[in-house]
C-alpha cells in the first residue's frame, strides 16, 4: 500500500484519523451543476431567469435545477466560508468535498477555505457522470484513467500540488455508459494500489447500486472501503435495501435538508422528508448496519445555503441528530455514524 497507510489525506496534507471529528461524507463547497440543468415548466420561464430573491425561494426549493444562477455554487465562496465557521461552532470537524473533474473542481479554493475555517476538507479525485466527460476522457484507456486518478491522490490534481484524499464522487448514469464503466474499472484499480476510500454516485434506479458494486468487485475494488451515495433517492423498499446492504459497502443517506414534491431527474421518485430519512436510518440500525451508515446534505445549489434561506452545512448537527436520538438511535450509534464510520472509511489501508 501507499505511504499514506494509516493516515487521512486532506487538502492541507495528511492527518491522523482521530483528528477528523464529526464528518459530513458528501458535500460540495464550490462547483457548477450546469451539466444537469432542467428546463422550467411552461409558464415558469420568467421566475427561472430571475435573480434569487425572497419571493421565489419556494419555487427554487421545488425546482432547484431550473435556474441557471442556482446551479453556480462556485459564486458563493464568501457565504460558504461563513457556513464553515458555523459548522465548526456546531461541532463539525471535517467535510468530504465530492467535486470531481467535469463540475469545476477547485482545489486551491478548498485549500483556502480549510485554512480560513479550521475545518478539515478532503478533495475528490476522478470523474463525474458521462455527461461531463470530455471526448478525450471517453477515448482514454482504463490504464490511462487509472494513472490519472492515482496521480491526483499521490501528486496533486488540476496542475496543483494539492492532493485528493478520496476517489469520487464517481458518477454513474442509468443505464450506465461505457465511459462510466471504464472510470469504475480505473477507480477499482487505483483503489487497489492506493488502499484509499471511494465514493460513488449511482444512477437513479433501485438496481443501480448493486450493479455498480458488482462492476467494482469484478475489477478488484474493495467494497468495504466504498460509500454508495444517494440511497435516499434510489432504494425505497426495505427488502431491497437490506439485500443491497449485504453487499458490504457504506450506506449513505446524503440529501438531508432536501424536501421537494417532484424530483426533476426521476418523476417516479417521491423524495423522502428528513423524518423519513431518519426512519430509514433507524431501520438500518435495528437491522444491524450501524457500522455501515454515513450521512450528509450533498449541498450543490445556492438555495440550500443559509444565505438564501436554506438549511446549510450544520443542519444535521443542529436538527437531525436530536431527531435521531428521539427515534431510537442512541448517542453511541450517532457517534458511529458521524465519527467512527467516516474515520474508518477515510483512513488509507
Swiss-Prot record:
It is found in: Cytoplasm, Cytosol. Its cofactor is a divalent metal cation. Pfam families: PTE. Binds 2 divalent metal cations per subunit. One of its GO terms (cellular component) is cytosol. The keyword Glycoprotein does not apply. A divalent metal cation 1 binds at residues 26, 28, 169, 298. It comes from the Eukaryota. GO terms for biological process: catabolic process; regulation of appetite; taurine metabolic process. A divalent metal cation 2 binds at residues 169, 201, 230. InterPro entries: Metal_Hydrolase, Phosphotriesterase. Coiled coil: none annotated. Belongs to the metallo-dependent hydrolases superfamily. Phosphotriesterase family. This is N-acetyltaurine hydrolase. It comes from Salmo salar (Atlantic salmon). The lineage of its organism: Eukaryota, Metazoa, Chordata, Craniata, Vertebrata.
